Regions:
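Domain-scale activation on soluble regions of proteins
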Residues: 1-376
Length: 376
């Protein structure tokens, strides 16, 4: 009998001195084996399936809960959106790699299309000798065109805002400014939001598998990325002007949805089903990894009294580097901890950060089966 998921999914584990992230017990029933890819097209599609399933499981969890939780609806939206969106990107690249076999050509394809779903779709259509029926492709083009207006580079649901450079004029210098992802409060219909992702992925999956039967889910939804409204307990309310604690909903979302996947895998394994371990492990790892990055950026951006322009510049300079962000905040953390018993604890945190960075220094390890240079 399947256990009910815990209502509270906050972490109760504390860092321990000397503990290693990659330590495992060979007789444990919870061991997950991650195999090196042999063919990148197949590996990309496998990753797409993993991220799709993770998104689907988490969405089911919050939409069909016995006691709906508004807090989860308003925050888990961000990690759900990323997981669904990422499986589309992986699926499209898997289709492209079915035709693009040369390593240098694959590298060029990835570099030129980056993460923009509309651009990737267009490039794949140009290269493929087979596509889906005309009506399906037209729906997909419209949907990805609208989606890309909100999330062109796959970062709008991983971070609370964009930092952009605003050029100056003859009277003043240029400066960094915050560009909010959502400029105003938006009540998103999460059911429609998820159904559209699933409709798009149905087309992509059939395209990759070269199936001849028509997709049908797209017929039930409009090719518009976000629709507002819906029943109160299926709404995700997002979007406020920039303020302190802007990172909190994202950090909460990535931490707690990772914890949910961990709970789900453990519960399934305890029930004799180990299949979910392999399928949900990588999405779980990425959710945790992004939570660490978000937590460090929260400290840097919201807790440290540094000049705003310096904060923006150094955050951009360090991109996704956990080691880089830790290096920036460490002097401030040590300064604030003087006269307390925290310095030793800070050393433990630093060790954990360095371990995570060593495993995944650029936030790609758990998202893709290869690097941008096509190294597997």
């Amino acid at each position: 009998m399947e256990m009910e998921a815990p209502h509270i999914l906050i972490s109760t584990v504390s860092p321990e001195k000397g503990k290693k992230i990659d330590t495992f017990y060979k007789h444990s029933k919870y061991i997950v084996k991650v195999l090196a890819p042999t063919e990148l097209s197949e590996a990309l599609f496998q990753y797409a399936e993993y991220f799709f399933e993770a998104a689907h499981k988490i969405t089911e969890f919050i939409l069909y809960a016995e006691h709906p939780d508004i807090g989860k609806l308003d925050t888990y939206f961000f990690s759900i959106a990323f997981l669904y969106r990422h499986c589309m990107e992986l699926g499209l690249k898997a289709i492209g790699f079915q035709t693009i076999q040369d390593r240098d050509e694959r590298k060029k394809f990835v570099k030129e299309t980056r993460h923009n779903l509309a651009v990737i779709l267009s490039a794949v259509e140009e290269k493929m000798s087979w596509t889906r029926p005309k009506e399906e492709m037209e729906w997909l083009r419209k949907y990805f065109a609208d989606l890309s207006q909100k999330d062109r580079e796959s970062d709008s649901f991983r971070y609370p805002f964009h930092i952009v450079w605003e050029p100056g004029d003859w009277e003043c210098e240029g400066r960094f400014v915050i560009k909010n992802i959502f400029d105003e409060q938006t009540n998103i219909d999460l059911v429609k939001f998820a159904n559209k992702f699933e409709a798009a992925y149905e087309i992509i999956r059939k395209w990759y598998k070269k199936e001849t039967e028509s997709a049908f889910e797209w017929k039930e939804v409009d090719p518009v990325f976000i629709e507002t409204g819906g029943y109160y307990y299926v709404q995700s309310v997002v979007g406020y002007k920039y303020r302190r604690a802007d990172f909190y909903p994202y950090t909460k979302a990535y931490l707690e949805t990772a914890n949910y996947l961990k709970w789900y895998m453990k519960n399934a394994t305890d029930s004799g089903n180990c299949d979910y371990n392999a399928r949900l492990f990588l999405p779980m790892c990425y959710l945790y990894r992004n939570c660490v990055e978000l937590s460090l950026k929260t400290i840097w951006f919201e807790e440290i009294g540094e000049d705003f322009q310096i904060k923006c510049k150094l955050m951009l300079d360090n991109k996704h580097s956990i080691a880089g962000m830790w290096k920036q905040i460490k002097p401030y953390v040590l300064e604030y901890s003087r006269g307390t018993d925290e310095p030793e604890y800070i050393e433990v945190i630093e060790d954990y950060c360095m371990q995570v960075h060593k495993i995944d220094g650029d936030a790609n390890k758990f998202r893709y089966p290869m690097s941008n240079s096509m190294q597997e």
